[in-house]
Regions:
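N-terminal [4Fe-4S]-dependent radical SAM core
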Residues: 1-19, 29, 225, 229-301
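Flexible, glycine-rich loop/tail regions that form catalytic "lids" or insertion modules at the edges
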Residues: 22-26, 67-68, 192-198, 287-288, ...
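Conserved SAM/AdoMet-binding glycine-rich loop
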Residues: 24, 55, 59-60, 339-487, ...
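N-terminal pre-triad scaffold of radical SAM enzymes
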Residues: 25-30, 289-316, 349
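Glycine-rich beta-alpha loop elements in corrinoid/cobalamin-binding modules
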Residues: 37, 56-251, 258-259
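Terminal amphipathic helices with adjacent charged low-complexity linkers/tails
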Residues: 61, 190-239, 252-253, 262-265, ...
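Flexible glycine/acidic-rich beta-alpha junction loops that bind and position SAM and/or redox cofactors
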Residues: 84-93, 141-143, 173-178, 202-205, ...
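Conserved, mostly hydrophobic/aromatic
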Residues: 165, 273, 308, 333, ...
């Protein structure tokens, strides 16, 4: 039975340790499961022979909290957690969230805002010279100058604000071991400048080190156009085979240097990483607090792949995991699934077999294996590349094996499915088996919008592709004698989306009968194309101007249009229709969205009847219909 890594001096004593090689400070609760970045990095280091202690959610108001495990021999590792701490804390309207799924008991407030920076500064108050190495999603996506939505300003590289010595971006398994080995061999942390997948800072750039020089921070902060240009240079240098080393100046005597990304892991390396001895659950010290809610989403799920060549503008995966797909072998996944079947809480259902995009189980084309992804072209956008190989045969074979495992009743796919890639496959085998075996009544996909010029800014396929998918989905369901639904994820207020576009989306919802219970407003998170559009008003790919809905009232109108049937939204919907010049949608005909006057408030007895339906009543089917109509979505899990 695997043991958790030490979280206290007592645990260290039990192992006979007097000092950790690394103390890993994390913003999440300690969950030893490969869906949590800190679990993978700590187990990879342990596998390489290093002693790692875990310091989870230390009290940032108390400098002594980071000393609980003593000074590490080689350095501190710092991660904000599985999410950027600001996304974790705040909704898109900048309101404080009430719960934190990555904290024991779901309690909010156990980590600071800008957690990586705060933790590092806390360490520096006590340990002046001990190396600090930062990583994880927060550090990775803030590695160079970036727009910060919450402060509404362009921030410097997190490496500078955190006073850290080295930043590891991307997934980090290979680079962390290389860094550890260098430090273990006696190398000074400031000399560790040669490892791919790292970012470091220097007083003077090495004239013998070829770099692509980005605009300096002062000019970026002064001119949004410069920032858009700089970001696109970064965007075109994310492939490990072709990326150049990037240099970002901060004044005359401070520079941040980003080395090219790490090469993708081989299948053997992926298998080894996921085959390490994880406890696969949260630390037992959290039991009295109710455990860690986030484990419920992944405990009986399988991570099949990494990377994504989908190119959604609002997604940062290209910056973090890259575009080249990396997969685990069937044997590795079957072994993990078989082990799941012996867990006492396993009920026979594998919740997911996927990754960033479930149906990407191979590189987009053969060229990517040796030359990487094209720096100036996308695989699926604006339409599938002629060199792309759309093939689900390996995924189909894997799913069949999983379905046949003793103790497995059903295998679900809950990661995002790219419907354009699905349609590009000439074989219908996967589509048919997806419908027959792997959906629990509804399939969640992410068309995001219906206006083609908005979809172009999003990096998504045109609306006609989604309609073709719906027709095929409906046809296969009918052939299989099944009645399953589609849940479309839709987004309001994305750059490029005007009020008229929002009205067009509302008309589509009217025509399909879909009534979304949840509406996702565009969230400008660090290091996405869409965020750069939001900040600069420019599309970095073309440098053309983009309309950006920033006014809170307009954003509220766009959201209200997606839920125009809600009486509480009547005033906003009417105002939006008038401003968009669409008063033809106010009236009594079937195509109208609202009546000329607001709806009457429901009577109290009617409200009571709605809240407490009679036992003989059937469950409401509001929002659910046969394809191409869609069911009202449950809590979103991801967008592809």
């Amino acid at each position: 039975m695997p043991e958790f890594l030490p979280i206290s001096k007592k645990d260290m004593d039990a192992r006979g340790w007097t000092q950790c090689d690394f103390v890993y400070i994390i913003g999440d609760a300690y969950v030893d499961h490969p869906s949590f970045g800190h679990a993978i990095i700590s187990r990879v280091l342990e596998d390489a022979g290093y002693k790692v202690g875990i310091l989870s959610q230390p009290d940032w108001r108390d400098p002594a909290s980071v000393t609980a495990l003593g000074e590490p021999r080689l350095g501190f590792l710092v991660s904000g957690g599985n999410m950027d701490s600001m996304v974790n804390h705040y909704s898109v309207s900048k309101k404080h969230r009430q719960t934190d799924a990555f904290t024991p008991g779901g309690v909010m407030g156990k980590r600071p805002d800008y957690a990586v920076t705060v933790y590092c500064n806390l360490i520096r108050r006590t340990y002046k010279k001990t190396p600090i190495i930062i990583g994880g999603i927060e550090a990775s996506l803030r590695r160079l100058a970036h727009y910060d939505y919450w402060s509404d300003k362009l921030k410097r590289s997190i490496l500078l604000d955190a006073q850290a010595d080295l930043l590891l971006y991307g997934m980090g398994e290979r680079s962390i071991v290389e860094v550890a080995d260098a430090l273990n061999d006696g190398m000074d942390i400031h000399d560790v400048t040669y490892i791919d997948g790292t970012v470091f800072r220097v007083r003077e750039p090495d004239p013998n080190l070829p770099c692509l020089r980005l605009p300096d921070y002062a000019s970026l902060a002064a001119d949004p156009r410069k920032y858009a240009e700089s970001f696109y240079l970064q965007y075109c240098n994310t492939d490990p085979f072709s990326a150049r080393r990037l240099l970002e100046p901060y004044g005359e005597h401070e520079f941040v240097v980003q080395n090219p990304p790490q090469k993708p892991l081989s299948q053997e390396e992926m298998d080894r990483v996921y085959g390490l001895p994880y406890c696969r659950t949260y630390h037992p010290s959290y039991e009295k607090q109710g455990g860690v809610p986030a484990i419920s989403e992944v405990r009986f799920s399988l991570a099949s792949n990494r990377g994504c060549f989908g190119a959604c503008s609002f997604c940062a995966l290209t910056f973090h995991q890259g575009r080249i797909i990396q997969t685990r072998s069937h044997e590795s996944l079957l072994a993990e699934a078989e082990a799941m079947t012996h867990e006492k809480d396993f009920k026979g259902y594998i919740h997911d077999v996927g990754g960033p995009t479930a149906n990407f189980r191979q590189p987009a084309c053969k060229k990517q294996l040796t030359k990487g992804a094209c720096p100036n072209r996308q695989c699926l956008f604006p339409e599938p590349c002629k060199n792309m190989i759309a093939d689900h045969s390996d995924y189909v074979a894997l799913l069949r094996k999983l379905r046949n495992l003793p103790g497995v009743k059903k295998v679900f796919i809950r990661s995002g499915i790219r419907f354009d890639y699905l349609l590009a496959d000439r074989s219908e085998t996967f589509f048919r088996e997806l419908v027959r075996y792997h959906i629990s009544g509804q399939l969640k996909v992410a068309p995001e919008h219906v206006s083609d010029h908005v979809l172009e800014k999003m990096g998504k396929p045109c609306h006609a592709v989604y309609l073709r998918f719906l027709e095929k989905y409906k046809k296969i369901n009918e052939q299989e004698h099944m009645k399953q639904f589609v849940v479309p994820y839709l987004m309001s207020s994305h750059p490029g989306c005007t009020l008229r576009d929002a009205v067009t989306l509302a008309e589509y919802l009217r025509d399909t009968g879909h009534e979304p219970e949840q509406v996702q407003d565009f969230y400008p998170t660090p290091s996405t194309l869409s965020t750069v559009m939001y900040y600069t008003g420019l599309d970095p790919r073309t440098m053309e101007k983009v309309y950006v809905p920033k006014n809170p009232h307009e954003k509220a109108m766009q959201r209200a249009l997606m839920q125009y049937r809600n009486p509480a939204n009547y005033a906003l919907v009417k105002e939006a229709l008038v401003k968009a010049g669409r008063t033809d949608l106010i009236g009594f005909t079937p195509q109208c969205l609202i009546r000329p006057y607001p709806p009457k408030a429901p009577r109290r007895d009617a409200e009571k009847s709605e809240k407490q339906p009679a036992a003989s009543q059937k469950p409401s089917q509001k929002g659910a219909a046969q394809p191409p109509r869609a069911a009202a979505p449950k809590k979103p899990r991801g967008r592809r």
